[in-house]
């Protein structure tokens, strides 16, 4: 059992060392993306100190030959400038950079002001709902009964009113289908 733990620990140490070695060998990013332009355009910037820079998209050259611009305008971000971009000089080339824009037409940018506005609106709506329920529910319990609200249906507080004899009204017959004698 101890030998298995030691082997697992050795495997963990080796994998961590390989990760740090790969990170040290990694080149710095030579192509940078700038999408904070006022007109919504996306710019790629290549950090080469060379005279001629060639821009590639998906392995095909997109810049004119012998171009000297270290920046490349991809156009508006709404036009979806997707692809694998790379800049190449006379002596070296950059790593591939994948540009992928996912546009959302019905999205809301959630910053601190938007979230606090939602919370404030929710608190205000709950307050008005609670006040409305309080005033509607509180009206019935506070009202006192008045003498004019009470109607006297039967005289002298009788429980039942006797039926009058020989009247053919709706409630004068109590025995169903039998007809009363006249």
From Swiss-Prot:
Keywords: Adaptive immunity, Cell membrane, Disulfide bond, Glycoprotein, Immunity, Immunoglobulin domain, Membrane, Phosphoprotein, Receptor, Signal, Transmembrane, Transmembrane helix
Glycosylation site residues: 66
Modified residues (Phosphoserine): 145, 148
Chief subcellular location: membrane
Residue ranges, Cytoplasmic side: 138-182
Domain ITAM per the UniProt entry, residue ranges: 149-177
Domain Ig-like: 37-94
Alphabetized GO MF terms: identical protein binding; transmembrane signaling receptor activity
Extracellular side: 23-116
GO BP of this protein: adaptive immune response; cell surface receptor signaling pathway; establishment or maintenance of cell polarity; positive thymic T cell selection; protein transport; regulation of lymphocyte apoptotic process
Disulfides per UniProt: 46-87
GO cellular component, one term: alpha-beta T cell receptor complex
Localization annotation: Cell membrane
Signal peptide as annotated in the record: 1-22
Residue stretches spanning the membrane: 117-137
Intervals of motif Di-leucine motif: 153-154
Alphabetical list of InterPro entries matching this protein: CD3_esu/gsu/dsu (IPR015484), Ig-like_dom_sf (IPR036179), Ig-like_fold (IPR013783), Ig_4 (IPR032052), Ig_sub2 (IPR003598), Phos_immunorcpt_sig_ITAM (IPR003110)
Subunit-structure text: The TCR-CD3 complex is composed of a CD3D/CD3E and a CD3G/CD3E heterodimers that preferentially associate with TCRalpha and TCRbeta, respectively, to form TCRalpha/CD3E/CD3G and TCRbeta/CD3G/CD3E trimers. In turn, the hexamer interacts with CD3Z homodimer to form the TCR-CD3 complex. Alternatively, TCRalpha and TCRbeta can be replaced by TCRgamma and TCRdelta.
Domain notes: A di-leucine motif and a tyrosine-based motif are individually sufficient to induce both endocytosis and delivery to lysosomes.
Function: Part of the TCR-CD3 complex present on T-lymphocyte cell surface that plays an essential role in adaptive immune response. When antigen presenting cells (APCs) activate T-cell receptor (TCR), TCR-mediated signals are transmitted across the cell membrane by the CD3 chains CD3D, CD3E, CD3G and CD3Z. All CD3 chains contain immunoreceptor tyrosine-based activation motifs (ITAMs) in their cytoplasmic domain. Upon TCR engagement, these motifs become phosphorylated by Src family protein tyrosine kinases LCK and FYN, resulting in the activation of downstream signaling pathways.
Name of protein: T-cell surface glycoprotein CD3 gamma chain
Organism encoding this protein: Rattus norvegicus (Rat)
């Amino acid at each position: 059992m101890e030998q298995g733990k030691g082997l697992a620990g050795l495997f963990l140490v080796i994998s961590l060392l390989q990760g740090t070695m790969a990170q040290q060998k990694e080149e710095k990013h030579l192509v940078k993306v700038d999408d904070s332009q006022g007109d919504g355009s996306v710019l790629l910037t290549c950090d080469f100190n060379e005279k001629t820079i060639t821009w590639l998209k998906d392995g095909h050259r997109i810049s004119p030959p012998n171009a000297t611009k270290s920046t490349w305008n991809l156009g508006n971000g709404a036009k979806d400038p997707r692809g694998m971009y790379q800049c190449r000089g006379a002596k070296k080339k950059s790593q591939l950079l994948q540009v992928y824009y996912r546009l959302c037409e019905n999205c809301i940018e959630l910053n601190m002001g938007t979230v606090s506005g939602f919370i404030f609106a929710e608190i205000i709506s709950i307050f008005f709902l609670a006040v409305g329920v309080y005033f509607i529910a509180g009206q019935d319990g506070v009202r006192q009964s008045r003498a004019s609200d009470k109607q006297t249906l039967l005289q002298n507080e009788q429980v039942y009113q006797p039926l009058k004899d020989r009247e053919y009204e709706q409630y004068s017959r109590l025995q169903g289908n039998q007809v009363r004698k006249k």
